Amino acid sequence: MPTTFQEIPRERPVTPLLDRADTPAGLRRLAEADLETLADELRQELLYTVGQTGGHFGAGLGVIELTIALHYVFDTPDDRLVWDVGHQAYPHKILTGRRNRMLSLRQKDGIAAFPRRSESEYDTFGVGHSSTSISAALGMAIAARLQNSARKSIAVIGDGALTAGMAFEALNHAQEVNADMLVILNDNDMSISRNVGGLSNYLAKILSSRTYASMREGSKKVLSRLPGAWEIARRTEEYAKGMLVPGTLFEELGWNYIGPIDGHDLPTMIATLRNMRDLKGPQFLHVVTKKGKGFAPAEIDPIGYHAITKLEPADKPAAPKKASGPKYSAVFGQWLCDMAAADNRLVGITPAMKEGSDLVDFSERYPERYFDVAIAEQHAVTLAAGMACEGSKPVVAIYSTFLQRAYDQLIHDVAVQNLDVLFAIDRAGLVGEDGPTHAGSYDLSYLRCIPGMLVMTPSDENELRKMLSTGHLYNGPAAVRYPRGTGPNAPISGDLQPLEIGKGVVRRQGEKVALLVFGVQLAEAMQVAEQINATVVDMRFVKPLDEALVLELAGSHELLVTIEENAIMGGAGAAVGEFLASQAVLKPLLHLGLPDIYVEHAKPAQMLAECGLDAAGIEASVKARMVKLGL
């Protein structure tokens, strides 16, 4: 196996067994003795594929053996296999008839980064956000019972995703309805237990065997007739298992817990899964894997190798670097440290996105004021509300797509009480290859309808810094939404001065047409304005809207064009239209933004072009409307 990034194969490896296992049916025709060799081939294939396309890396390497075992033992796709999040699903895609399409992974018109029902019958549930698998698999298990079907339902969830409340809600409900389903905990961080070895593997085989299950059920029927006897026996079994395995929590929730077992020991996994396949009631299998298994750099640095960019040919000349500024997330991270030094009331909160949201420096400089709440967006927001009640100034650093999961808390716990919570909303707009499940397409729409909410959209790095200061000093809930990637390299002021709330800025004076820009499309708007001599306005604030400026522009121009990287429906442009209607002002309007579709994965530039939000698309749309109006 390769030991460095440069050693990842650039040519498709020779894989005679994998060639015969292109589908689960083909896999099940292989001898069990061949499966470990197949695992080596699949690992090489995954290294090659992701090296060519880029994408999620470490998680897939860690579940090679688990994926093989699941498709070998269960009758997929008739048996329903649900992957949580989907970062680990690349081996699953390779084994389910999509190997020859893997080089289109995450590319325009190619296969998706995550399981998609529309892509394959083996993708039984579409995912992207975490902690949904148990609920989905439970729904499938209940449906199977209602349909008198014997098909199995299996959820595979990581130890990180299991921290979310939704997962425990599903675990609790499953035991209430005594669902026939299997949950597999893919523990690749060893955060629950390190007790893995020969003894626990042996114990798992015993506890999952039909003999043990039959004896257990028979004893339960007998002892249930004696008051208190079954409870004593259950506790005795629980304590005995608890001495060797860490499953007490799941046993208390009513699940039959098996494990932990070595997730890279194929014979043990296959034997255990065969035993558990026909057990009744909710079954829980704890599998310990190593993220990045088989590729030393990823094993050593699983966070750094969570995802990688594609390998370029060794002889390819380096592409000239475009002039660009720092990443927007880096600007936020620097501001957070600067404001924390100036205001000891500031605290930083993130739901498991320390690296992505650029809170690493803050966490190291102010560890007592940094709170990573794990994958618990609802808790993160209400935690911030509680802190704000006591005079703290919380900053919730969160991706736009994940803030959707805490919308009730945002309204009920923060906004209704008018609490001082600043939401630093990263990955707003289109995010590229991860596709619609990770896009931040709706935040302006769902934020601007909340009374008292301050909503800002920066056009560059310096505007972002000023808006963060504005939100921090605002009395009430505030949100700043900014995109993934780098800015236009605007000079950044080192001060912490706020903006005047609700005031836009005219960046270019033209005639007839005014381009009202909400966000980072300002540069494209300026290009277009040069071609048609349009006025360009950096609106800055979605709420409160600069109503005086909008009225002024409506009075001095023949066409107003709103531009935003948000859903057109209910977005910033809609706010302009609603205001003009309320003032009985009739003025031609053109709203440019994200259409009423899920924009499929592609490179960000391709997605913007598809939506008409690049300079060429904006110019074409504006000119077409000018022709209609006779301008």
UniProtKB/Swiss-Prot annotation:
Chloroplast as UniProt keyword: no
> In the record, which residues are listed under signal peptide?
none
Q: Report any Pfam family annotated for this entry.
A: Transket_pyr
Which residues participate in thiamine diphosphate binding? 87, 128-130, 160-161, 188, 295, 377
Q: Where does Mg(2+) bind?
A: 159, 188
Entry GO MF terms:
1-deoxy-D-xylulose-5-phosphate synthase activity; magnesium ion binding; thiamine pyrophosphate binding
Q: Which GO terms describe its cellular component?
A: cytosol
State the EC number(s).
2.2.1.7
Swiss-Prot/TrEMBL GO biological process terms: 1-deoxy-D-xylulose 5-phosphate biosynthetic process; isopentenyl diphosphate biosynthetic process, methylerythritol 4-phosphate pathway; terpenoid biosynthetic process; thiamine biosynthetic process
CC cofactor note: Binds 1 Mg(2+) ion per subunit. Binds 1 thiamine pyrophosphate per subunit.
Query: In which pathway is this protein known to take part?
Result: Metabolic intermediate biosynthesis; 1-deoxy-D-xylulose 5-phosphate biosynthesis; 1-deoxy-D-xylulose 5-phosphate from D-glyceraldehyde 3-phosphate and pyruvate: step 1/1
What this protein catalyses is: D-glyceraldehyde 3-phosphate + pyruvate + H(+) = 1-deoxy-D-xylulose 5-phosphate + CO2
Assembly and interaction partners: Homodimer.
Q: What protein family does this chain belong to?
A: Belongs to the transketolase family. DXPS subfamily.
Per the entry, what this protein does is: Catalyzes the acyloin condensation reaction between C atoms 2 and 3 of pyruvate and glyceraldehyde 3-phosphate to yield 1-deoxy-D-xylulose-5-phosphate (DXP).
Q: What is this protein called?
A: 1-deoxy-D-xylulose-5-phosphate synthase
Q: What is the lineage of its organism?
A: Bacteria, Pseudomonadati, Pseudomonadota, Gammaproteobacteria, Pseudomonadales
